Regions:
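Cytochrome P450
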Residues: 1-432
Length: 432
């Protein structure tokens, strides 16, 4: 389909403000209208091109020479010195170094620990019959995994909880005097200071037992492994002095890991429980067919779309599908909408754990494909395997109102009351 300028500037029948966090409380009709009527729509209020179709989000994500991340991925927010706000070759340089901490081998080694951790958390709630799934469960798994990847002690882990939530709360706030943004900046500075101390400790003791140690070694030696498996798997090295990760780059990545890696997985877990609660037949299907867990994970990521949006900046004047785009124009990609595109997914608003094929964009696509995708998949898989094995009928207590935070970036579910039959009633062996 070729768009016309008229379609690009069409007036929707309802208010669409893609920078208003409340828009994402119930955006589905707006997404459908955009996909059908103006898939490349000019948002006059925010001075953005809004992109809603799977095909177009994929195209923009794959062509960084035309749609750059280097000018920032969030509107009205300065581009941080972070891997998500870089184009190649700089992006690829950092990605090659950082990816050593997230190989399939590393994730496989973590799987048993994630299972143990999940069961420890379930132990705390199993006899209660109810919980706040976010506060009592989903918040803990990804943060503890990240903390242990980083080699943090229990006290540092507790501070990490506070810093992560405070930094994420700053999303959507642009006034530098806003107390929420000030607090987020202070939390980021405190976290960075701790990371600097840890980097110096790893440098002093030479340890490569955790992610900070591995990446500190990458900084000091500028070395990549010959096998691509990284220092967690061995120390065969090829000396490449151009591949040096600076301390500031490492700290910025760790901030991204804590904020994005924690928040997105937390929301995938919470949104996954919402999806199973809305579609109880799919819950039953997974209980009866546990071998569907891998495809269920992919469907959770598609249906939930924990990351809702990102921005790119046009690098040169060109025409895309009949619409003239100018250098400096900002393009706002709606991943949630792309993952509900009728042109790609049959019955896209249905949650189907055996959906195949499932070419979702929940982890992105192209050069910025999520570095932590393997880890996120493992966490989601293990959590729902263990959760449904022990609390077989767990479900959201109510679905008419899901409480979200003030974010236009991530789903940001803040609370989710859940109910279930106490474990001992399903399994007498668990009775005290």
């Amino acid at each position: 389909m070729t768009l016309t300028e008229g379609a690009a500037t069409a007036t929707p029948p309802f208010d669409i403000d893609v920078l208003d966090p409340r828009f994402y409380d119930d955006p589905w009709e707006a997404y459908r209208w955009l996909r059908h009527n103006a898939p490349l729509w000019w948002d006059e209020r925010n001075q953005l091109w809004v992109v809603s179709r799977h095909e177009d989000v994929s195209h923009i994500s794959r062509h960084q020479e035309t749609y750059s991340a280097a000018h920032g991925v969030r509107p009205k927010v300065a581009a941080p010195m972070s891997i998500i706000s870089m184009d190649d070759p700089e992006h690829n340089r950092q990605r090659r170094l950082i990816s050593r901490g997230f190989t399939p081998r590393v994730v496989r080694r973590l799987a048993d620990h994630i299972r143990e951790l999940s069961n420890q958390i379930i132990d705390e709630i199993a006899e209660r019959g109810e919980c706040d799934f976010v506060e009592d469960f989903a918040i803990h798994v990804p943060l503890i995994v990240i903390a242990e990847l980083m080699g943090l002690d229990p006290d540092q882990r507790d501070r990490l909880y506070r810093w992560s939530d405070t930094m994420m709360a700053g999303d959507g706030h642009t006034d530098p005097d806003d107390p929420v943004l000030v607090a987020a900046a202070e939390a980021g500075a405190e976290f960075a200071a701790m990371c600097s101390e840890l980097i110096e400790q790893r440098r002093a003791d030479g340890s490569t037992d955790d992610l900070i140690g591995v990446l500190t070694k990458a900084f000091d030696e500028g070395a990549l492994t010959a096998t691509g498996e990284g220092a967690f798997a061995g120390n065969d090295r090829v000396d490449r002095t151009a591949d040096i990760l600076t301390p500031d780059e490492l700290i910025m990545f760790l901030i991204l890991l804590v904020v994005a890696g924690n928040e997105t997985t937390r929301n995938a877990l919470t949104g996954g429980l919402v999806a199973f609660s809305r579609f109880p037949d799919q819950h039953r299907k997974l209980l009866e067919n546990p071998d569907l867990i891998d495809s269920a994970v992919e469907e959770i990521v598609r249906y939930v779309s924990p990351v809702m949006s990102f921005m790119r900046t046009v690098t040169h004047d060109h025409t895309y599908k009949g619409v003239r785009l100018k250098a400096g124009d900002r393009v706002f990609m709606l991943y949630q909408s792309a993952n509900r595109d009728e042109a790609v997914f049959d019955d896209p608003d249905e949650f189907r754990i055996d959906r195949d094929p499932n070419p979702h964009l929940g982890f992105g696509i192209g050069t910025h494909y999520c570095l932590g995708a393997n880890l996120a998949r493992a966490e989601i898989k293990v959590v729902f395997t263990e959760l449904f094995a022990r609390l077989r009928d767990i479900r959201a207590a109510r679905l008419d109102r899901i409480e979200r935070g003030d974010s236009s970036l991530v789903l940001s579910i803040k609370h989710l009351p859940a109910v279930f039959t106490p474990e001992s009633r399903f399994n007498p062996a668990k009775r005290p």
